[in-house]
UniProtKB/Swiss-Prot annotation:
One of its GO terms (cellular component) is cytosolic large ribosomal subunit. Signal peptide: none annotated. Forms part of the ribosomal stalk which helps the ribosome interact with GTP-bound translation factors. Is thus essential for accurate translation. InterPro entries: Ribosomal_bL12, Ribosomal_bL12_C, Ribosomal_bL12_C/ClpS-like, Ribosomal_bL12_oligo, Ribosomal_bL12_oligo_N_sf. It comes from the Bacteria. The gene is rplL. It comes from Campylobacter jejuni subsp. jejuni serotype O:23/36 (strain 81-176). This is Large ribosomal subunit protein bL12. GO terms for molecular function: mRNA binding; structural constituent of ribosome. One of its GO terms (biological process) is translation.
Amino acid sequence: MAISKEDVLEYISNLSVLELSELVKEFEEKFGVSAAPVMVAGGAAAGGAAAAAEEKTEFDIVLTDGGAKKIEVIKIVRALTGLGLKEAKDAVEQTPSTLKEGVAKAEAEEAKKQLEEAGAKVELK
């Protein structure tokens, strides 16, 4: 029996955030690719060159507001950071709090997306 694209998509849609993150890392390693978004060129040439030279490669993920769905946000914080329940709860309730420091742009943007979908407010610094 052949596996269809729909079967693969159904399987992926049932993965937890942590399992999906691990799957993406395995794809990156196996196929030598990156899940980072493609940069689109634009703007003035002189301004673009200066921006490229100063573009950050490492970011701090700062939770500025836990939002209304704190339980969901706490679960995501635990999955992203590996913190225990009490530590994750404290991080969500005592904002602003730095969740991770010095992470790659793609990882920081993915974490921000997950947290914002759960109702939290996040800054990348």
